[in-house]
């Protein structure tokens, strides 16, 4: 239409040409585990309560690894069954760093399923001497990646990345019929398209 208007009605420019092409969607298939695969993997870390709890939280809440590793007891409300995400952990140049979350939308409150809140309550009951502002999980992302690689090998489930546990959680929510906007908010995404 704009080309026609340029040719026959003296329109100076075609605004669509200035805008440029939208481009192709970069949405490539994401790797994820179904619940049966996750459960098979989880069996391989059942002898490590701290690691097991960390993987349970990643899978059932969809939080980022840095968000998990920054959690303190103050961030947990076992009565309300919620986790407040308000910071992130990184290890930079051999030093532990607590930083702001990835984006403003990353600051959020995540609900836990009843069984997870109960498991977390049991886990926390065995934490002696931990201060309310200390990190609940005192290991690093590389420790989690190592445990995951070992667990994958031992369980025989398909290989995915640590971050793909977020995709696993999102996929589970889609299967449950949760609206895309709710999933995006739960995962702390700025845009629904990211989800």
Where does each model-flagged region fall?
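Active-site/catalytic core of tyrosine-dependent DNA strand-transfer enzymes
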Residues: 35-36, 88-91, 113-158
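Non-catalytic DNA-binding core/recognition domains of DNA-processing enzymes
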Residues: 1-5, 19, 112
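C-terminal catalytic core of tyrosine-transesterase DNA break-rejoin enzymes
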Residues: 7, 56, 60-67, 147-155, ...
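Short, contiguous acidic/charged loop-to-helix segments that flank catalytic cores in large enzymes
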Residues: 29, 45-46, 97-107, 134-140, ...
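Conserved tyrosine-mediated DNA breakage-rejoining catalytic core shared by Y-recombinases
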Residues: 21, 37, 70-122
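Basic, Lys/Arg- and aromatic-enriched nucleic-acid-binding interface segment
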Residues: 11-71, 79, 115, 126, ...
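Hydrophobic recognition helices of helix-based DNA-binding modules
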Residues: 1-6, 120-124, 173, 177
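N-terminal core-binding DNA-recognition domain of tyrosine site-specific recombinases/integrases
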Residues: 3-15, 27, 49, 138-142, ...
């Amino acid at each position: 239409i704009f080309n026609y208007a340029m040719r026959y009605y003296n329109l100076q420019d075609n605004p669509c040409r200035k805008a440029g092409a939208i481009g192709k969607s970069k949405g490539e298939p994401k790797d994820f585990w179904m619940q049966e695969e996750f459960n098979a993997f989880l069996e391989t870390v059942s002898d490590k309560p701290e690691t097991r709890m960390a993987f349970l939280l990643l899978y059932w809440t969809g939080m980022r690894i840095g968000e998990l590793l920054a959690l303190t007891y103050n961030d947990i409300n076992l009565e309300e069954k919620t986790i407040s995400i308000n910071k992130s952990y990184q290890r930079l140049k051999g030093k532990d760093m607590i930083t702001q979350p990835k984006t403003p939308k990353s600051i959020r409150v995540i609900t836990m399923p009843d069984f997870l809140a109960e498991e977390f309550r049991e886990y926390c009951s065995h934490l002696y001497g931990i201060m309310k502002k200390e990190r609940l999980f005192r290991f690093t992302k590389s420790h989690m990646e190592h445990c995951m690689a070992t667990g994958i090998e031992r369980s025989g489930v398909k290989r995915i990345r640590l971050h793909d546990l977020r995709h696993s959680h999102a996929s589970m929510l889609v299967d449950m019929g949760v609206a895309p906007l709710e999933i995006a908010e739960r995962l702390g995404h700025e845009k629904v398209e990211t989800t």
